[in-house]
């Protein structure tokens, strides 16, 4: 059975690293909304053109456009064996859209992996990246904004019965051991 996953967690929680392990071991397609946006912009698709208008104005791209881009990507053949969404959904409205879209296509979210890491460790990891724009103030703001966005999604998927909270503050191998345990027990 296809494994359809959502990765949640604050910046620095290790989602990308764990996603790489999952792709390697489970042959699941990793779908990043950033990649979807870049592809639509580069290919100058109709959705890309619409998104560009908002982005050029410094505005957030509306859910309808983001949802349409994700739906278009989920229609592609390579996701039949399973997919892993990273960076989507970003809010409860997008989560509701995704559930309906998947249901309409005979699919569902198999599991939502929420990587939980203490703020102090997240801050330390992000500062350790050495990016010029990663000042303590910027990092604290990014964590606060992302926490406000993540908590309703954690609650949404908890109520849906598909949330698996994983302690992302440990060694990579220990975190991945827990990820594998969840994935290997999905029906």
Curated annotation (Swiss-Prot):
SUPFAM superfamilies (alphabetical): P-loop containing nucleoside triphosphate hydrolases (SSF52540)
Keywords attached to this entry: ATP-binding, Cytoplasm, Kinase, Nucleotide biosynthesis, Nucleotide-binding, Transferase
Cellular component, GO, one term: cytoplasm
Name listed for the protein in its UniProt record: Adenylate kinase
Subunit architecture: Monomer.
Binding locations of ATP: 12-17, 129, 170
GO annotation, biological process: AMP salvage
Region (NMP), start-end ranges: 32-61
Pathway(s) annotated for this protein in UniProt: Purine metabolism; AMP biosynthesis via salvage pathway; AMP from ADP: step 1/1
Reaction(s) the record says it catalyses: AMP + ATP = 2 ADP
Listed Gene3D superfamilies: P-loop containing nucleotide triphosphate hydrolases (3.40.50.300)
């Amino acid at each position: 059975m296809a494994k359809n996953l959502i990765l949640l967690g604050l910046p620095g929680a290790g989602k990308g690293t764990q996603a790489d392990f999952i792709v390697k071991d489970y042959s699941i397609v990793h779908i990043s909304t950033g990649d979807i946006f870049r592809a639509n912009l580069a290919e100058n698709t109709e959705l890309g053109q619409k998104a560009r208008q908002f982005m050029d104005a410094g505005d957030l791209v509306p859910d309808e456009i983001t949802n349409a881009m994700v739906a278009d990507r989920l229609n592609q053949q390579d996701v039949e064996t399973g997919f892993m969404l990273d960076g989507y959904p970003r809010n409860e409205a997008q989560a509701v859209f995704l559930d309906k879209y998947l249901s309409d296509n005979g699919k569902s979210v198999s599991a939502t992996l929420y990587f939980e890491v203490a703020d102090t460790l997240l801050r330390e990891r992000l500062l350790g990246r050495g990016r010029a724009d990663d000042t303590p103030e910027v990092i604290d703001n990014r964590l606060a904004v992302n926490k406000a966005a993540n908590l309703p999604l954690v609650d949404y998927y908890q109520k849906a019965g598909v949330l698996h909270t994983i302690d992302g503050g440990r060694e990579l191998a220990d975190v991945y051991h827990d990820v594998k345990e969840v994935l290997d027990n999905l029906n």
